[in-house]
Regions:
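Acidic/histidine-enriched, beta-strand-rich ligand/metal-binding domains
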Residues: 97, 106-109, 146-154, 162-167, ...
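Short glycine/proline- and aromatic-enriched beta-strand/turn motifs that initiate or cap beta-hairpins
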Residues: 21-81, 236-246
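Flexible, solvent-exposed loop segments that connect beta-strands
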Residues: 50-75, 108-134, 167-177, 211-231
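Bacterial Sec-dependent N-terminal signal peptides
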Residues: 1-25, 243-246
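Residues that define the transmembrane beta-barrel architecture of outer-membrane proteins
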Residues: 34-36, 78-82, 133-139, 153, ...
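Outer-membrane beta-barrel channels and translocator barrels
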Residues: 33, 91-95, 148-152, 193-195, ...
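Residues on the lipid-exposed face of transmembrane beta-strands in outer-membrane beta-barrel proteins
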Residues: 40-44, 82-90, 102-104, 137-147, ...
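Predominantly the C-terminal beta-signal and adjacent terminal strand-loop region
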Residues: 179, 189-246
Length: 246
């Protein structure tokens, strides 16, 4: 993942350096003077869940007996997804813009559980898997600071907040996430003025606990409880590469 990020940043930097060697004719010279404009966005993202495991805990089984469990849960890889949306951008002054970008984020998370209280035939903890489908509807609010335009490119940095609503969830899953989350976004990108193409790489970190603790009380199959109680909190993380077209 780090290698992928560094490669993307290197390509963007090299492209800017090459195009900045000499002055050229500017395409769409007045496009940044518009007070407001619309656009569309498509992209890919990589998502992860950062769990805090509960450790040794107890639960009541189907027969009413109290039992102990010690199960760990982890999303042991960054899972890819895709993003589609629209945007509206307001020009504040020659360097600052304010962007509102409603979007949909689709993906799948792969969770791995290890039951430390139960062993398989060769002495390893029993392993269970969960495939968690995710579909988020979001509306990002971003403040953009752009450098002075040079030729047909203009690098910028951005930051903002992105509230999301989780549209997915299955009552047969071990782990379930809350219906709403709030993300902090920080990133960088560059405007290209062939037809106002804007690639942007940003990092998103969940500011709220996304783990639905109330789901424990709704589990009907009591044999799932050791796995449902494996985590006490979870925070979502994403790395998003998005292309804006205006």
């Amino acid at each position: 993942m780090k290698r992928l990020i560094m490669t993307i940043l290197a390509v963007m930097t090299i492209s800017i350096v090459i195009m900045a060697q000499e002055r050229t004719v500017e395409n769409r010279p007045y496009t940044d003077l518009r007070p407001f404009h619309f656009g569309v966005m498509v992209g890919t993202h990589f998502q992860d869940l950062e769990f805090t495991n509960t450790g040794l805990t107890s639960y009541i089984d189907a027969d009413g007996n109290e039992k102990e469990s010690n199960v760990t849960v982890d999303q042991d890889r960054w899972d890819a997804g895709f993003t589609v949306g629209v945007l509206g951008e307001f020009r504040l002054n020659s360097h600052f813009q304010f962007r509102i970008a409603p979007a949909m984020y689709f993906g799948t998370r792969h969770l791995t559980f290890h039951n430390l209280m139960e062993k398989d035939g060769i002495g390893n903890p029993i392993e269970e898997k969960q495939e968690m489908k995710t579909a988020y509807i979001s509306s990002a609010f971003n403040l953009i600071f752009g450098a002075q335009r040079f030729n047909n490119h203009r690098p910028y940095i951005m930051a903002g907040l992105n509230p999301m609503i989780n549209l997915s969830g299955n009552n047969d899953d071990y782990i379930k996430l809350k219906k709403s989350e709030m993300f902090l976004e920080i990133g960088a990108g560059c405007d290209f003025y062939l037809f106002k193409l804007r690639p942007e790489l940003k990092f998103m970190y969940g500011l709220t606990d996304s783990y639905d603790k109330n789901y424990i009380n709704k589990v009907k199959d009591k044999s799932m409880l050791p796995y449902t109680k494996a985590a006490k909190s979870a925070h979502s993380k994403m790395i998003a590469l998005t292309f804006y077209f205006e």
